UniProtKB/Swiss-Prot annotation:
Induction per the UniProt record: Induced by infection with an incompatible race of the fungal pathogen Magnaporthe oryzae.
Protein name as it appears in the record: Chitinase CLP
Leader sequence segment: 1-18
Pfam families found in the cross-reference section: TAXi_C, TAXi_N
Catalytic activity, EC: 3.2.1.14
PANTHER family to which the protein is assigned, alphabetical: ASPARTYL PROTEASE-RELATED (PTHR47965), CHITINASE CLP (PTHR47965:SF60)
């Protein structure tokens, strides 16, 4: 090779590597910056997805212990004694047999390759499949815009195509976000050298994409000039663990409807789970009855729709929405407050409490918890996706705190107002 050609090649390589997006893509390093991804709500399933697998969507699951997806026939595997194999078996899906950490490698019978147990909570099915490494991708961000693409290696589980049943059309797997070492945000934290912390701003149906930020940092929503939402949260409360489940749990001391305390049968703290698997908040039967009755009393003068029309199932309280009136926080109905450990309120206004089920009918969007015989006692409340929409929710594993902005309509913005235009 001539000296001139060698110098030209060296110069090209140096220039390419000096570009931040090129370095990030090659090294899987976002230079210590958080990553951002768009969140889409699927109209058919009410599930939320992020396009982080070659631009294809994975379903967000706050209770999912693993990231799993369909794999190519040829893929790398991890050995059974690898520490990630142990982490993959930290939580066992329901109905899945305990059959060890792996199986003999077909290509090398003397090698034990690790298997995991991906679980589809929407179909209730699980499988046994290889633990592998996969490249995922998102964009580095300054909290205002995406900056440049970042590709990084993640430990994931393969899954048979049959496990994709009941996922949104086009989804290739599930991005587990639970409190485990193999959850998506934990792997982003390790690979990008950022905080083990993430924020979800879930969109409402038909209102554009929401935003997920992995690794902490600010979040600015349009219009320009608005303050950092992550720095102006309405409240925080401690996160608690459940020894049997890897999801996110907080504690409430009481519930109020229309600023009056709801009388419950227990004086014990109320366990509350946050969950993207269900569309609407589910309440334990005793809590459900007390809350629904209190809401009915507080709306006694409003025009009820009885019996509720078929589209309203499984809701109990439905109203003629033309009679409700409106505010910038949604329908003018009594607010519901969860009074949390530490004293802050998670307040549910009409925008998150009332689901529009037909042109002129809106219903109180809470349901009863579905319990199964032999399963652990359910939480008092499971906050579903609808009640988290247009509300920045911050999950901070390092501080073991949960933060929330409250309904962003009150700030005259929404979760669909992040500027996804790539910064120049």
């Amino acid at each position: 090779m001539s000296l001139h050609l060698l110098l030209a090649v060296s110069l090209c390589v140096a220039l390419a590597s000096s570009l931040p997006w090129a370095a990030a893509s090659a090294n899987g390093n976002g230079n210590g910056k958080p990553l951002v991804a768009a969140i889409t709500k699927d109209a058919a399933t009410s599930l939320y997805t992020v396009p982080i697998k070659d631009g294809r969507p994975l379903v967000l699951d706050l209770a999912g212990a693993l990231v799993w997806m369909s794999c190519a026939a040829a893929h790398p595997t991890l050995e059974c004694h690898h520490h990630f194999c142990m982490h993959a078996h930290s939580y066992h899906p329901p109905g899945c047999p305990h059959n060890g950490y792996g199986r003999a490698d077909v290509e090398d019978p003397f090698r034990c390759k690790c298997t995991a147990h991906p679980y589809n909570p929407f179909s209730g099915e699980s499988a046994t499949a290889d633990l592998t490494r996969t490249r995922l991708s998102a964009n580095a961000t300054d909290g205002k815009n995406p900056l440049y693409p970042v590709s990084f290696a993640a430990v994931t589980s393969c899954a048979p195509d049959s496990l994709l049943a009941k996922l949104p059309a086009g989804a290739v797997g599930v991005a587990g976000l639970a409190r485990t070492r193999l959850a998506l945000q934990a792997q982003v934290a390790r690979s990008q050298k950022v905080a083990n912390k993430f924020a979800l701003c879930l969109p409402s149906g038909g209102g554009g994409d929401g935003v997920a930020i992995f690794g902490g940092g600010p979040l600015f929503l349009l219009p320009p000039g608005r303050p950092d939402v992550a720095a102006t949260l309405a409240g925080e409360t401690p996160l608690h663990r459940n020894k049997d489940l890897p999801g996110y749990f907080i504690s409430a001391t009481k519930i109020a409807v229309n600023q009056e305390q709801v009388q419950l049968y227990t004086q014990e703290p109320l366990v509350v789970e946050l969950c993207t698997r269900i569309p609407y908040t589910a309440l334990r039967p005793d809590v459900y009855r007390a809350v629904v009755d209190a809401f009915a009393r507080a709306t006694a003068g409003r025009k009820r729709v009885t019996p509720p029309p078929p589209p309203a199932a499984p809701f109990e309280l439905c109203y003629d929405s033309r009679d409700l009136g409106s505010t910038r926080l949604g329908y003018a109905v009594p607010q519901i407050d969860l009074v949390l450990e530490g004293g802050k309120n998670w307040t549910v206004f009409g925008g998150n409490s009332m689901a529009q089920v037909s042109d002129n009918t809106a219903c109180l969007a809470v349901v009863k918890v579905k319990g199964e015989k032999g399963s652990p006692p359910p939480p008092a409340a499971i906050i579903g996706g609808f009640q988290m929409e247009n509300n920045l929710v911050v999950f901070d594993e390092e501080k073991q705190r949960l933060g929330f902005s409250g309904l962003l309509w009150g700030r005259q913005t929404t979760c669909s107002n992040f500027n996804f235009t790539l910064a120049a």
